[in-house]
Amino acid sequence: MDAAPAISRPETRSSWLFGCAAIAAAALLVGVTVAFHGPMTFRPLGVRVQMGDAMRPLAIAAVADVALFAFAFRRCAWRRVASVLAVAIVAVSVLAAARRAAPAYPVSDRALIELATINALDGRQLYGPYSRYGWQHPGPMLFYLLAPFYAAAGSRTAGLAAGALAINLAALAAAIWVLIRHAGPALTVTFTALFALYFARVPGLVVSSWNAHATIVASAALVVISAAVAAGQIRLLPLFLAVASFVLQTHVATFPLVAVTAALVVAAIGRRWIGASAEERAGLKAQANRAAWVLAALWLLPLVEELSRPAGNMSAMWQFARQPPRGGTLPQAFDAWASALTGVFHAGLSLPQGRLIVRSMAAWPRVVAVLHLLLLAAVVVWAARHRRHVHAWMAAQSLAGSVAALWAVTRIPDGIHDHEVFWISAVGVVGAASIAAAVVGSVVSERRPLVRSRGPLVAGLSATLLLIGVPLEGLRQITVTGGPSRSKAADDHVMRVTGAIQSEIERQGSRRPMVVIDQRVWDWAAGVILQLRRQGVRVVIDDGLVAMFAGTLAPDGSEDLEISFCGGPCHERLISRPGNIVVLLTDHIAIDARPLHR
């Protein structure tokens, strides 16, 4: 009797690859269906199986995808399939968690962020986030990036957390990809290790959609990508401009970082142009043309807003920037800058909440910050001598960005707040990674056979662990809290005020209610206006505040009900006016109404 033909190892491995991919794809499809359409019932082989939790099939998909990665380690095509599946599994898992998160009732800036995101879904958002100085940040990129996740999450606040996680993961992945491809194992490992420490210190960062938080990881990616472009990777120029546009449009405090990185990139490209051949110049022109189109597309809406009115938002920002410096003293600015730059090693590191910074008496952050700059300068020289061009430019960009940040802090008026300098901590982490990689490189030569063979493996493993750990932590944050911070007492208060106002609007039969806000309670008013907008009620507000409260209407004389939010003596004045109605009176806020008969 003839023996059965032996199955070769390549055929066996291919069977395992196809099997893992099929299981991952099928489980992912089930997870998507359950997440977006509700529970499902299957009858495989006549057995009734009900699936009501999307996380179970997604967990199966994740396990199968990990197995696919393991079997496809040396096969590029299958690694790409596994990577695509991994991105899809993470995205669906995060959205599934956001869709089942408890309803949230944000106030203050977070309510304004959600209002602007709703406005972006309607295609009407032209402004960036609101600034306490009376203008808006330069552009609305943040809101248009958050909008798809918000919609996919069923218009829940947790969808903003999902969008923030996606933005941070994309920025982090871009930075790590650039480092692996162009910078070498040492810089990749130190970068991932320090950012793992950074995220562990401020875990809520990865899911926060507040603009002061949403630009942190992107700022670090900006430094890394700009270094690669300056070192000769011109094809990354469109990516650099996209990240720079996002960072600047979302938080104008990062202007010094964007300006110096762009200046060094332009200088490097100019130097390359001078010695380039005709063929190389043609390539540079092609990349510059692509970059120009990217820049034009990303800045179209801010330009439309600026040119569509006599005094646009950019004009207001320019007038503010031209004012004489009203910042604090140089010692105060230096202390705030030093604490931010060394923040990853600082015991008091926490997510900023808009609090005024109290000057620290500790001397070590100042000493370490100055030493940090000196070491970065030394790393630039060392890396250039060893022809580690990306490393040299990364240290140079970190050094220039840190110095520019100090200048910027000296110009902050009306006291230095934590959210205005927090972005500097990301630049500090990138600089620390540059220094640490130089130390490792000077001790362990990359020419050693063991380092050359195992270094990329260690770098890939560290990157993989970070890119797995960040979404897992983000998923935990969304699952447990629905976002970076929640307060049940605040939620209950917003619900109570919203319910009272909505009842009064219905009782009066109002079709165009107008809201008047006492500055002392604008944060609560923002939360209530958001809840009304969710329920389809768009209120009229003072013309000067329409940009701040996105989606509200400007007065036109047809308003039929005035609703006042009071947090102080204004309530005592209002109750004496004819026709006043006390809608609600609490320890925090007073709501008065008055019919308008025109």
Model segments located where?
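Membrane-interface transmembrane helices that cradle and orient dolichyl/undecaprenyl
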Residues: 9-13, 222-239, 247, 272-276
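Hydrophobic/aromatic-rich transmembrane helices and adjacent perimembrane loops
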Residues: 48, 52-57, 215-218, 251, ...
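Membrane-interface helix-loop-helix junctions at transmembrane boundaries of multi-pass membrane enzymes
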Residues: 76-80, 180-187, 233, 272-289, ...
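Extracytosolic helix-loop segments that constitute the early lumenal/periplasmic catalytic or substrate-binding loops
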Residues: 112-144, 148, 326-328
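Loop-to-helix entry region of an early transmembrane alpha helix in multi-pass inner-membrane enzymes
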Residues: 140, 144, 152-170, 205-212, ...
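Transmembrane-helix motifs of polytopic, lipid-linked glycan transferases
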Residues: 162-184, 190, 221, 378-381
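Membrane-interface alpha helices of multi-pass inner-membrane proteins
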Residues: 223-225, 237-265, 294-297
